[in-house]
Amino acid sequence: MNKIRKGDEVIVLTGKDKGKRGTVQAVQGDKVVVEGVNVAKKHARPNPMLGTTGGVVDKLMPLHISNVALVDANGKPSRVGIKVEDGKRVRVLKTTGAVLAA
């Protein structure tokens, strides 16, 4: 069970974007793509068959999952634990003990 999932609100713990918050757009193995964080400029070649123009495009690049943490209700970074409730595994915030939606 992944502790961080698509749609979770996270904060960046390390790197050039430290302290920034965003929503997880995708989880790719041990990496996550966070909205508005770790944006790189990519040069795109024009493709007339697809109708795309060339130029410099902003692209979201993945971060390692260990460099982000979920945000609790107080706005602080929190680690995530796994708990069994009614025979199902649920994610629980370590700081507040709140159960996260599945």
Curated annotation (Swiss-Prot):
Stored PROSITE patterns: RIBOSOMAL_L24 (PS01108)
Gene Ontology MF terms: rRNA binding; structural constituent of ribosome
Keyword Zinc: no
CDD domains assigned: KOW_RPL26
Xref: Pfam families: KOW (PF00467), ribosomal_L24 (PF17136)
Gene3D superfamilies registered for this protein in UniProt: 2.30.30.30
Any GO BP: translation
Entry GO CC: ribonucleoprotein complex; ribosome
Keywords: Ribonucleoprotein, Ribosomal protein, RNA-binding, rRNA-binding
Presence of the UniProt keyword Protein biosynthesis in the record: no
SUPFAM superfamilies: Translation proteins SH3-like domain (SSF50104)
Signal peptide: none
Subunit structure of this chain's protein: Part of the 50S ribosomal subunit.
Family: Belongs to the universal ribosomal protein uL24 family.
PANTHER family in the record: MITOCHONDRIAL RIBOSOMAL PROTEIN L24
Summary of the function given for this chain in its UniProt record: One of two assembly initiator proteins, it binds directly to the 5'-end of the 23S rRNA, where it nucleates assembly of the 50S subunit. One of the proteins that surrounds the polypeptide exit tunnel on the outside of the subunit.
Protein name: Large ribosomal subunit protein uL24
Organism annotation: Cupriavidus metallidurans (strain ATCC 43123 / DSM 2839 / NBRC 102507 / CH34)
